[in-house]
Design a protein with these regions (language model features):
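Short, electropositive alpha-helical surface patch
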Residues: 29-40, 96-107, 257-265
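A conserved active-site cap/scaffold subdomain adjacent to cofactor or substrate pockets
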Residues: 88-91, 95-129, 133
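Metal-coordinating catalytic core of metallo-dependent amide/deamination hydrolases
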Residues: 1-86
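Histidine/acidic-residue-rich catalytic or RNA/ligand-binding cores of hydrolases
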Residues: 52-64, 92-97, 114-123, 138-156
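Alpha-helical segments flanking ligand/cofactor-binding loops in enzyme cores
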Residues: 32, 68, 93-94, 121, ...
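Active-site microenvironment of metallo-dependent hydrolases
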Residues: 170-268
Length: 268
């Protein structure tokens, strides 16, 4: 219902995808049902080979690797987003590339769940549209950038790895991914840009900052707590750390009460 609602909405501010969990929790019957119910022009999002069990289960139950299974069910394509892709081989990456499917890397989630490090640098080299995400592990994209940077250096034993790839994923890849669902141009700061999405950060460095070292300043010097003002679609949502679009104190109080009740339900 939400997907249909989003398709009918003409604000270009919301979009829907067919949400799937992971291959090891999705039967063939559910795959068929998703194919049947998915509206035209909409893709899927699904966790792929996040853990080794996902791959082992797919090989055992279906006799094929995960990306092959998704391809056989027509899940792949330019509107579909694959999360993680840790245990994928060259053939699977080629299949992702050939179908123009999108991938999102979630470094802290992978490390926190002790899942491993995906071949993300290889995916970028192959020309797969790759973005940077969090899988809910953090809400600070600068933090995700910093962790991705050191994770791939460590995994590849290469101090030069990820310097260029990760900011490319964050600033270019994420915008291109979003633009497969939204019409307005995203990921740019220029006069007349339809999105008009801006954040203002309180960052006053002691060392020079210019176009040649801006990525270093952003990665090492900036974090989410420095955001002072946010603008979305031309509307100021927060100014000088004051939220303007809701009663922040009430929202926080309601959240704390809901969290308390949820904890009581879980532990009862």
């Amino acid at each position: 219902n939400f997907i249909k609602h989003a398709l009918e909405d003409d604000s270009d501010m919301i979009a829907g995808m067919m949400g799937m969990h992971a291959s090891f929790t999705i039967s063939d019957e559910t795959m068929a049902l998703c194919n049947e119910l998915k509206p035209e022009g909409v893709g899927y999002h699904i966790h792929v080979a996040e853990g080794i069990y996902d791959l082992h289960q797919c090989l055992k139950e279906h006799g094929k690797r995960i990306v092959d299974r998704l391809h056989d069910w027509n899940i792949l394509g330019p509107k579909t987003l694959l999360g993680h892709c840790i245990y994928v081989n060259e053939h699977e990456m080629d299949l992702i590339k050939d179908t123009d499917t999108m991938v999102v890397h979630n470094p802290e989630s992978n490390m926190g769940n002790a899942c491993g490090c995906p071949p993300t640098m290889r995916m970028v080299q192959k020309g797969i549209l790759t973005g940077l995400g969090t899988d809910g592990y953090t809400h600070d994209m600068m933090e995700s950038w910093k962790v991705a940077n050191v994770l791939h250096k460590h995994s590849l034993c290469d101090p030069n790895a990820a310097w260029g790839e990760v900011p490319q994923m964050l600033f270019e890849g994420n915008a291109k991914i979003a633009n497969r669902y939204f019409k307005k141009q995203l990921g740019v700061l220029k006069e007349g840009a339809a999105a008009a999405d801006v954040i203002i950060v309180n960052y006053n460095p002691l060392t020079p900052m210019n176009e040649s070292n801006i990525n270093g300043h952003l990665m090492f010097g900036v974090n989410g707590s420095m955001v002072q003002t946010t603008v979305c679609n031309g509307k100021v949502l927060m100014k000088d750390r004051e939220v303007l679009v809701c009663d922040e104190a009430k929202v926080m109080a309601d959240c704390r009460q809901a969290a308390k009740e949820l904890a009581e339900d879980i532990n009862s």
